């Protein structure tokens, strides 16, 4: 009908597809049980199939608008490039960095500069790139920028290959937990030894813009 549904899951949003009152195993964030009191939207497709949006913390949202207006929607038009796309490259960074006074951690998590990188992966990317999370973006050398771009793509592809990171809520489309949390280099490893060879530093935890940040006391001390 020339309309589009935009759905954001937030932190705890889940989609359940029911057929004859039974949850499909293909439900996104599939679980066998869910609390009906957290159902916020119900879409009836036919007499036997319904889609339910369930969200405990209510950080997500659903919007319906005309398809022709998708690119002008405020939630989409201000997004930065996909980090796995060709558009996220050295030339893009060279054009963007001079305008930015943020530290590297906040830059990676700011959706208007690069979309889709959350706290976990920002920590992992910065560590692999041996950059202090408090370092200002405009102080990065061209060599570090190239390394950062390379590691953004490397970490995200590795996380996808392992099914994501299931610390608490996240589940894959079939209800399975991800396994990338077993590969964490710094995230949630406060007090542990750095995994980089010949480093020996300890992982420290600080807060940057009220978000937990983990980094190595030696190889990221720059």
Language-model segments: residues:
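Basic, nucleic-acid-binding surfaces and adjacent catalytic neighborhoods in DNA/RNA-processing proteins
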Residues: 15, 92-222
């Amino acid at each position: 009908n020339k309309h589009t549904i935009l759905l954001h899951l937030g932190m705890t949003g889940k989609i359940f597809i029911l057929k004859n009152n039974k949850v499909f195993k293909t439900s996104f964030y599939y679980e066998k049980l869910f609390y009906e009191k957290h159902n916020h939207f119900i879409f009836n497709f036919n007499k036997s199939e319904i889609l339910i949006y369930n969200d405990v913390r209510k950080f997500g949202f659903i919007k319906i608008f005309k398809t022709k207006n998708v690119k002008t929607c405020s939630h989409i038009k201000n997004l930065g490039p996909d980090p796995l796309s060709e558009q996220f490259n050295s030339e893009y960074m060279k054009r963007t960095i001079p305008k930015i006074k943020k530290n590297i951690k906040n830059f990676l998590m700011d959706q208007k500069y690069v979309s889709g990188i959350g706290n976990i992966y920002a920590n992992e990317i910065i560590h692999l790139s041996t950059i202090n999370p408090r370092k200002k973006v405009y102080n990065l050398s061209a060599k570090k920028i190239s390394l950062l771009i390379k590691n953004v793509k490397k970490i995200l592809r590795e996380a996808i290959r392992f099914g994501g990171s299931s610390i608490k809520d996240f589940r894959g489309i079939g209800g399975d937990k991800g396994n990338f949390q077993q590969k964490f280099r710094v995230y949630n490893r406060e007090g542990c030894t750095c995994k980089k060879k010949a480093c020996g530093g300890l992982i420290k935890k600080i807060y940057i813009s009220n978000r937990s940040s983990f980094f190595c006391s030696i190889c990221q001390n720059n």
